[in-house]
Amino acid sequence: MLPPSWPLATILGAGILALAAGLWLRQRRRYESAASVAAAYDRWTTDRLLERLWGDHIHLGYYQKPAPGRHQRQDFRAAKAAFVHELVRWSALDQLPPGSTLLDVGCGIGGSARILARDYGFKVVGISISPAQIERARSLTPAGLSCRFAVMDALALELPDASFDAVWSVEACPHMPDKQRYADELLRVLKPGGLLAVADWNRRDGPMGRGERWVMRQLLEQWAHPEFATIGGLQQHLQQSPHAAAMAIETDDWSQATLPSWIDSIAEGVRRPGAILGLGPKAVLQGLRETPTILLMHWAFATGLMQFGVFRGSKPS
């Protein structure tokens, strides 16, 4: 029997955590092939839970440092839009003229593509391996906005060489079993003089302790990731590509600027309970099932086990 001094909220909280852990341990999403990645994103898209909580940007946000003496935090969804604008600025895509062509590799349901087309005048082609994501991206895109979407494998792009003025890819690399092939395809379709903008979840260099190895295994097996590259490793893959043409790749670490996203993604369920409850009991269980992985991601990025790498470069003419 539980001690009578235990408050009901504590008992309920412990029960919810136990349920979340049970679902998490029994329902892994190990990477098996490109089809397993497509299936995972098809499920995440059709159940609408991720979209209800994260909006139409299925990536982390960029949080500006508050002004001195102020502690107000950025809104989760506003931070996601800010991420797009910050990566555009950092990679100098804002120097390209309206009408420039841009390929979004791993476009999700098209949130970034729509900003890039609407706010910068790019002609965007977005690709994803998930048919459900592409269907949803098309349905969310207003008529007249210069965005096209297609189901395509990032490791075998069905696109001509040197066909885009810019190539953009955010948080897609973790799902790629062949990082060199991924780098090669990004640069193959980039025109001479074109700009590259990539963001990636990276593991740190160096050996890991036993606990860190356990965490890393969970981060791989829960969300269909075959392996994480290091920042230096992906930089090397890009620079040594036969399509790089002596291209210099610059990098930065945005771990701190993106870190609040993980806890905010859980907090969205508290801020918008109707978003989950309106989808029914299955969505509630699904939300619980994702929570341990999100918490481990936060821990990994907070401690430096994981890093949020960004990569930019201009392909020589």
Residue spans for each PLM region:
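Conserved alpha-helix/loop element of class I SAM-dependent methyltransferases that forms part
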Residues: 64, 77-98
